[in-house]
Amino acid sequence: MTAAAPPDGAGPVRDEDAFDIERVAGWLRENATDATGLAGIPTVGQFGGGASNLTYLLRYAASPTFPSGRDLVLRRPPVGTKAKGAHDMRREHDLQAALAPAFPLVPRMVAYCQDEAILGSDFYVMERVEGLILRRDIPPELGLSADATRRLCVTAIDTLADLHAVDVDAAGLSALGRGPGYVARQVAGWSERYRRARTPDVPDAETVMAWLAGHQPPDRGTALIHNDFRFDNLVLDPAEPTRIVGVLDWELATVGDPLMDLGSALAYWVQADDDPVMRRLRRQPTHAPGMLTRAEVVEHYADRAGLEVSTEQWRFYEVFGLFRLAVIAQQIHFRFFHGQTTNPAFAEFGAAVAYLDHRSRSVLGLPEPGEDPERTLNVG
């Protein structure tokens, strides 16, 4: 049972993702760390972003303590998920709860439920972080100048560096790490994922995988890394949009090499002078006047983090980021190719995989096999 009118910022709940909100609301009143303002049944909406865990907005009516009402966010695995290791709600909840004292930009946790009888799976609930989230373009009504956009960009990079500076031992998060060898594990793991998910219509990527395997640097440090650090996971202050008030989506966070995190983040970083295919793949406003280029991001991050990273050294992290993104896209394309999803948004993911392999080869100066990806991906 769900509400007919969804809360602001969320759409209607899809039928296959619906749940008994009265049962969840009752459980929350009994188990929330702070149950103030949780009387009654909230209206419910579903956020449409992301391709993994499901995210809902619960909006409670106004009360004396919360005159504007109270908004909570509920996170759960996809319906029907059996492999809990891939959608570990307990891990995601506990990581943010432990991190909050050292990195206050994480949302405040409200409750974790492991009783699958309540909703059909385990889930957790957190306070909603109020603010703006940038998508493909900066809304013109924000009136951000190039100078203001640059300040926002620098603040985002500094936020990532601040996260990497958290003392994981003091925060009680060291158990997330598996010790030295993070780079090697990532190269081997993502290569295996690509081979398992490959379909006949995409490159074999063996040349890029072989290069990564043969040019692995030693770990450059051990830090808490986000692993999905993008503008659409950052919440901005509406009154001061150059200020970040929240960092969302900690599903992939772990302890590992901070430069691998930066490389993964910059795979999504499309700048104004990129080729037409790369510009078509853009999902965040990193092309806007004032945004730093990828090279400037690396330079600023290295200065902030106290690291020395040469252009040649950075090449490994750049190619790894592009390859990792290709694997993520291919895992989705695999489902589309085999008819497991008919979402039209996934129709060009195979061409995107081919392009990312092409771009990786270009960075490495390797010969290009087969057809030019720009001919297979619509750039109009």
Task: State where each predicted segment sits.
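ATP-binding pocket architecture of kinase catalytic cores
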Residues: 41-207, 211-224, 239-242
